[in-house]
Every structure is written in structure tokens, then in C-alpha cells.
Amino acid sequence: MAQYVRTAGDLVYDCSCELKLAYSHILGDNIDRFPLDLQANPVRARQALDSAVNWALRKTRRNYKVVVPQWYPAAPEDTAQFLMPLDLDSDGRADLALVVSKANERIYRGHTVLTLEMAYSNARLVARPDSEWLLPSAGEPDEVD
């Protein structure tokens, strides 16, 4: 039988660990997932990414449920992955989700970014997301009366 984590604690993001981002992949290969105004300006996109990560880490220190576990079939067994909300335009709502996994006991690595639709699909494979930012309607435009 497959084993996806060693302990239940592996499913909770450890805020005491350092987070290192794969900027070249996130901004090089996935810039098309960013809001349009940031796609044309990689310098602003990186600044927005750094700011959004800092915001998410502050929120996670107050509420561990902000970072949601995900399951990705291609990830190595025994590796927990997480989805961290990224509010890139500072409007209080997530625009993308950062995929994070442990590189070692003290470091997490931010691998890539997913659209909210992609993130919701991956998160619900573990359990129903218990989060205020990752909802079934994530990413859908608001209805206009």
C-alpha cells in the first residue's frame, strides 16, 4: 500500500522552516498564470510574488489552515505537498496557489504556481479543503446583476 506521509504532522505546514522559491520556473514557465498586468512586467511579478508569500506566511502563523495539503500523483511517495494562497494584487483574495514541499527538515521549496481551479482539484483529493480561500467557485468571475 502506498504511504503518502509519515505522520499526520506532515500535513501541517511548519512555519519555522525557511521557504525558498523556484523563481526561474515560477516566473519563466508559469508567468501566463499571473494576472495580466503582471505578465508583461517580470520585475513587478517577482515583487508581487514575494509580497504575496510574506502575506501568506503571516496569515499561516495565525491560522495553520491557510496552507492546504494537496495530492499530486507524480510527487514521490512520502512527500507531503501544500498549497499556499498568493494574493498578488493585494485585494485580499488569492489569485494563485504556490505549490510547496519539504526539501529537507528545515527548508520548504516553492516549486510552481497553480490556478485556483487546478489547486482546488488537487486539494480535494486529500480531503475537503477547510480553507476560506480555496473554494469550488475559486477563480470564477463574480456574477453581475
Question: What do the predicted segments below correspond to?
Answer:
Residues T79-V144:
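Compact beta-sheet-dominated globular domain cores
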